[in-house]
């Protein structure tokens, strides 16, 4: 079994309301000015 750890950050956009991060809800959403999650694999270990 291989277990991986992720390091996630919230991408913030200057145009978002009050500087709060938010996620796009769908393709039909007209307001896509907010940031989203950006994840990177930190490390993987074998158990």
From Swiss-Prot:
Coiled coil: none annotated. It is found in: Secreted. Its main location: secreted. Keywords: Disulfide bond, Ion channel impairing toxin, Neurotoxin, Secreted, Toxin, Voltage-gated sodium channel impairing toxin. One of its GO terms (molecular function) is sodium channel regulator activity. Pfam families: Toxin_20. It comes from the Eukaryota. Expressed by the venom gland. Contains 3 disulfide bonds. InterPro entries: Hwtx-2-like. GO terms for cellular component: extracellular region. One of its GO terms (biological process) is regulation of membrane depolarization. Disulfide bonds join 4-34, 8-39, 22-44. Is toxic to insects. Reduces amplitude and frequency of spontaneous firing and inhibits voltage-gated sodium current (Nav) in the dorsal unpaired median (DUM) neurons of P.americana. Belongs to the neurotoxin 12 (Hwtx-2) family. 01 (Ap1a) subfamily. This is Mu-theraphotoxin-An1a. It comes from Acanthoscurria natalensis.
């Amino acid at each position: 079994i291989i277990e991986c750890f992720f390091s996630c950050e919230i991408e913030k956009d200057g145009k978002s309301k009050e500087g709060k991060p938010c996620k796009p809800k769908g393709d039909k959403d007209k307001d896509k000015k907010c940031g989203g999650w950006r994840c990177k694999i930190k490390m993987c270990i074998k158990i």
